[in-house]
């Protein structure tokens, strides 16, 4: 086969279109004698063959996404290997498609088999994107929030495009309040608060009691070391537990937009203003990569990995 001249401009265009590596793009164009569309197919086929190898790689980057439709909201997390991919328009489109389907699917198992616009399932779509982007991708998790009446607030922090970013939050407010605009504004503010303050529960009764007892034990041991009488230690521990609750329980936290008031007090004031009860039924907070072990590599390992594909 005679030598085919492939310009750097075409290689760059193929890389931007597919997210594949520069050398992979150049080789694909050589193999297809410069045919751009055939080169895309070549990369996809090559990538599909290599998808099993990529599936073992740690994915701790990527994007979270939130979407609200009426009285239903969903949050998802789709992971990639590098932050670079999160800025890839193709990957962003994939995440948008998945979160749109999640509103109807309602469970992650149904979501994986849901059909995208190209009639491929979400699972198949992810595999195809592994092929063209050149990184392992995973639909890690999803959660749904539904209310019977009221408002759902959503907030995405560090957005790369609207509704896609590093932290996604939903907050459900059940209420018969007629002024939906003010109710939605409160739900939005509480969602922003949740993103920034990372509460562990709505109220103290729903807080993990194992966590509470662990903190209580730590506080007790610290107080005992100070040599105080037992009855004083008990009071000190209860005081520290109350402070702990004010740090991790949503309703007891100082409100981000008005720190002198707790979230509970802000809700009570809004109830008086709107003439209706307001109850936080659920909140969801997804932070990208939380709980995932990050793979540590030195520079030499990274270079070797790149050169060996």
UniProtKB/Swiss-Prot annotation:
Record-level GO cellular component terms: cytoplasm
Location of this chain's protein in the cell: Cytoplasm
Q: Which SUPFAM superfamilies match?
A: Elongation factor Ts (EF-Ts), dimerisation domain, UBA-like
What Gene3D superfamilies does the database record attribute to this sequence? Answer: 1.10.286.20, DNA helicase RuvA subunit, C-terminal domain (1.10.8.10), Elongation factor Ts, dimerisation domain (3.30.479.20)
What the entry lists under CDD domains is as follows: UBA_EF-Ts
Q: InterPro entries, from UniProt?
A: EF-Ts_dimer_sf, Transl_elong_EFTs/EF1B, Transl_elong_EFTs/EF1B_dimer, Transl_elong_Ts_CS, UBA-like_sf
List keywords of the entry alphabetically.
Answer: Cytoplasm, Elongation factor, Protein biosynthesis
Principal cellular location given in the protein's record = cytoplasm
Question: What Pfam family is a match, any one?
Answer: EF_TS
**A GO molecular-function descriptor:** translation elongation factor activity
What are the boundaries of the region Involved in Mg(2+) ion dislocation from EF-Tu? Answer: 82-85
Task: Say which family it is in.
Answer: Belongs to the EF-Ts family.
Task: Give the protein's function.
Answer: Associates with the EF-Tu.GDP complex and induces the exchange of GDP to GTP. It remains bound to the aminoacyl-tRNA.EF-Tu.GTP complex up to the GTP hydrolysis stage on the ribosome.
Q: What is this protein called?
A: Elongation factor Ts
